[in-house]
């Protein structure tokens, strides 16, 4: 079982879209005290808020913000018990060198390339994860094999942080809009203790 509880203090999705993944976690767990999300697209952000209300999530029990998660994170000072995400595959981002002084990216010594923000999202989520938290993120298979900066970041996550718990391969054509195969990566902060 991904989340070993029938109650979560909070759950966060940094690329929440319409909020369906957050609602799925709430349905699966049963009790989630607070739901957090961030979405870049204004229309989809409004849809996520409506979706929460339509699924009986009281407005005081969710905090969904509209902005660019990598450039202007809206929940940066919080740590979450559960993080779930299906970020857009291979999306571009600024990769501005100023981010090397950002706590989300600095420990790795390298930034995800501007042509693929996959590892920028992963390191953002690791930064936001509570010390006993669990994260589940859908990523393209390429994050397992690409070299250069992504290889450096991947090695640091596995060898230094020891956050990677499980990888589940997913078939091609599973997600609307992309035919490439994907994977579900599960990370647990508690993996650090199992070295």
What are the language-model segments listed below?
Residues 3-6, 185-190:
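Short, compositionally biased segments
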């Amino acid at each position: 079982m991904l989340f070993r509880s029938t109650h979560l203090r909070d759950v966060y999705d940094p690329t929440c879209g319409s909020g369906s993944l957050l609602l799925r976690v709430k349905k699966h767990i049963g009790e989630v005290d607070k739901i957090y999300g961030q979405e870049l697209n204004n229309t989809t952000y409004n849809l996520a808020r409506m979706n929460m209300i339509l699924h009986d999530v009281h407005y005081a029990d969710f905090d969904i913000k509209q902005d660019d998660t990598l450039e202007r994170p809206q929940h940066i000072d919080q740590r979450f018990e559960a993080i779930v995400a299906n970020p857009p595959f291979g999306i571009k981002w600024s990769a501005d060198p100023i981010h090397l002084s950002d706590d989300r990216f600095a420990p790795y010594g390298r930034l995800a390339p501007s042509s693929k923000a996959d590892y920028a999202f992963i390191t953002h989520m690791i930064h936001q994860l509570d010390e006993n938290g669990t994260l589940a993120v859908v990523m393209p298979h390429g994050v397992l094999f690409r070299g250069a900066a992504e290889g450096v970041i991947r090695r640091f996550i596995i060898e230094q942080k020891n956050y990677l718990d499980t990888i589940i391969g997913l078939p091609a054509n599973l997600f609307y809009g992309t035919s490439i195969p994907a994977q579900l990566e599960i990370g647990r902060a508690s993996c650090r203790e199992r070295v």
